[in-house]
């Protein structure tokens, strides 16, 4: 994608999307996802879009956690919770998709409005609350998709109606339903929008959760030709460096395959030039203001683990340069979400093209 194409999205397409639903960000999200779901039903249309947008080059290929990825640029969880548009994401040049976060029980999420744009900072605030159709529904949809066009990771979280003391059983139910269809499974213990969820990052609670899931993983893997699935833990950017080190110790003790760093932040530090009423909205902040903290966390994890633990870097990646910086910081793969909102569907191609011109981040 050259500069003129980027400008066309920014000044031609984006203003139209931002006006949908009288400016309601979630309405624009829903309508865009509906269009992508329709595109996903047509193999010919997906093939045509893929021909125009996807860069296929062996130098982009990665094998991470034993999974072959056609390129390192993925779609972050939250964009397509119920996995309705996976073929379209593949056609747009993503190397993998993480669907979810999905919960055992279907749930509507928090009351609307719950998604807010901060265009001055190229950011979003969301308090969606894991709105999704449930693990069983996602499992049925993924079963129909097999074989998937690109690796599909599945992010699982706790149902809102499930008490924290029963969280392990809730995660296990989702895990067992989705195991057959997931390239990897991400354990989301870091969303700020489900009451009490972040407590599961505490060492003792995380240890118990991972032990239970790895028990199921080993059991299910014995009868599956692909064996156990890689388990990744998604952490919050708001953890202290000491807390991150404790999480890494627990993850190492329980055979976690990688870390996803990071989720959205509850901090509003450095958020300037925006409507104070928007900045005060409850929820997780994503986008441009998160990049510095996300890079710090990725560098910290890479240093503490001696670059031996795979990291999926996510948070504030809006440009090819952001993607390169994340890979240079130690990420094995990267994910985008808010950058897609502000810079358009050809962002994966721009990042992959940049990777090909920078030998430091080629495999």
Curated annotation (Swiss-Prot):
Source domain of life: Bacteria
Listed CDD domains: DHOD_2_like
Note describing how the cofactor binds: Binds 1 FMN per subunit.
Binding residues for substrate: 81, 126-130, 188, 193, 263-264
Localisation per UniProt entry: Cell membrane
A Gene Ontology BP annotation from the UniProt entry: 'de novo' pyrimidine nucleobase biosynthetic process
Top EC group: oxidoreductase
Active-site residue list: 191
A GO molecular-function annotation: dihydroorotate dehydrogenase (quinone) activity
Chief place where the protein resides: membrane
Any one Gene Ontology cellular component term annotated for this protein: cytoplasm
Pathway named in the protein's UniProt entry: Pyrimidine metabolism; UMP biosynthesis via de novo pathway; orotate from (S)-dihydroorotate (quinone route): step 1/1
Catalysed reactions, as listed in the record: (S)-dihydroorotate + a quinone = orotate + a quinol
Binding-site residues for FMN, renumbered to this chain: 77-81, 101, 155, 188, 234, 262, 287, 316, 337-338
Membrane topology, as annotated: Peripheral membrane protein
Keyword match Lipid metabolism: no
Pfam families documented for this protein: DHO_dh
E.C. numbers: 1.3.5.2
Similarity-based family: Belongs to the dihydroorotate dehydrogenase family. Type 2 subfamily.
NCBIfam families hit by this protein: PRK05286.2-5, pyrD_sub2
Annotated function: Catalyzes the conversion of dihydroorotate to orotate with quinone as electron acceptor.
Full protein name: Dihydroorotate dehydrogenase (quinone)
Organism name: Chloroflexus aurantiacus (strain ATCC 29366 / DSM 635 / J-10-fl)
Gene it is expressed from: pyrD
């Amino acid at each position: 994608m050259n500069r003129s194409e980027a400008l066309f999205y920014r000044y031609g397409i984006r203003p139209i999307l931002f006006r949908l639903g009288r400016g309601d960000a979630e309405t624009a999200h829903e309508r865009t996802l509906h269009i992508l779901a329709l595109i996903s039903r047509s193999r010919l249309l997906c093939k045509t879009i893929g021909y125009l947008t996807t860069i296929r080059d062996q130098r982009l290929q990665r094998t991470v956690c034993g999974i072959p990825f056609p390129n390192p640029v993925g779609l972050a969880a939250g964009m397509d919770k119920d996995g309705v548009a996976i073929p379209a994401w593949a056609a747009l040049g993503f190397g993998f998709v993480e669907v979810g976060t999905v919960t055992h029980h279907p749930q509507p999420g928090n009351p609307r409005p719950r998604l807010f744009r901060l265009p001055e900072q190229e950011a979003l605030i969301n308090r969606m609350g894991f709105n999704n159709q449930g693990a069983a529904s996602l499992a049925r949809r993924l079963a129909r998709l097999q074989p998937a066009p690109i690796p599909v990771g599945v992010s699982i979280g706790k149902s809102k109606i499930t008490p924290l003391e029963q969280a392990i059983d809730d995660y296990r139910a989702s895990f067992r339903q989705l195991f057959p269809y997931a390239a990897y499974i991400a354990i989301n213990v870091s969303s700020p929008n489900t009451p009490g969820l972040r407590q599961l990052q505490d060492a003792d609670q995380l240890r118990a959760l991972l032990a239970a899931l790895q028990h199921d993983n080993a059991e299910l893997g014995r009868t599956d030709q692909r064996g156990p699935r890689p388990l990744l833990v998604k952490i919050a950017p708001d953890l202290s460096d000491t807390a991150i080190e404790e999480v890494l110790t627990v993850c190492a003790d329980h055979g976690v395959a990688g870390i996803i760093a990071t989720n959205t932040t509850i901090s509003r530090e450095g958020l300037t030039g925006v409507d104070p009423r928007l900045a005060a909205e409850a929820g997780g902040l994503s986008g441009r203001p998160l990049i510095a903290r996300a890079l710090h966390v990725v560098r910290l994890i890479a240093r503490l683990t001696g670059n031996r633990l795979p990291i999926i870097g996510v948070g504030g990646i809006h440009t090819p340069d952001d993607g390169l910086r994340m890979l240079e910081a130690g990420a094995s793969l990267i994910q985008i979400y808010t950058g897609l909102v502000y810079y358009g569907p050809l962002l994966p191609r721009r990042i992959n093209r940049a990777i090909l011109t920078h030998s430091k981040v080629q495999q």
